[in-house]
Amino acid sequence: MTENIYPIYDRMMSREDKESLLGQKGIMIWFTGLSGSGKSTVAMGVERELHARGILCRILDGDNIRAGINNNLGFSEEDRTENIRRIAEIGKLFVQTGIVTLACFVSPTNDIRNMAREIVGKEDFLEVYISTPIEECERRDVKGLYARARRGEVKNFTGISAPFEKPDHADVSIDTSIIPLEESVKQLTDLIIDRIK
């Protein structure tokens, strides 16, 4: 890693200054689970609920990240790791600005999720495992990815041709095939409110 020879951190406004301005604390809510499990759907519900309560938040997901800053990455193991590393670094900036950050990424291994937790900081990281079974995710298949993976058109597809490790350290586990969306959103919103106020 290249050393920054002109560090300015000691002259920047502090995290506390920014959180005081917003009247909230920053936190990273890291949603993990298979494609189609409901990560983004639950996160969007949480975002709407937090917004209605005057809480500033931002969703980071594969669509908005891979279309921009990570558009040069593929799906090899190395690229997936770099994808999550960059997301965690960006998310850390949001969190340190006092923003509730909702990150929705498959992030299929415990190592990769632990890396994100270390980058963001354990005290600012809440891991949410959307544990919807693969059969339900495949039934939903909103983007047609499971069908393409089954035909061999998508390589390294988590759950089909690449493994997904159940999280070792999830703070919350939600199966969206059993728990209604409204209940999932309420559970997470209440948990977040308790952490940031």
Residue ranges and their predicted role:
Residues M1-M28:
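Extreme N-terminal, non-catalytic leader segments
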Residues K39:
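Conserved lysine of the Walker
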Residues S131-I134, R139-Q187, R195-I196:
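Small-molecule kinase domains that catalyze NTP-dependent phosphoryl transfer to phosphate-bearing small molecules
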Residues S35:
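The conserved Walker
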Residues M44-E89:
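Conserved substrate/cofactor phosphate-moiety recognition/catalytic segment
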Residues I59, F125-Y129, D171-S173:
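Conserved beta-strand scaffold positions in the cores of enzyme catalytic domains, especially
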Residues F31:
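Hydrophobic anchor at the beta1->P-loop junction of P-loop NTPases
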Residues G68-F75, G91-A149, N156:
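ATP-dependent NMP and nucleoside kinases share a basic, alpha-helical "lid"
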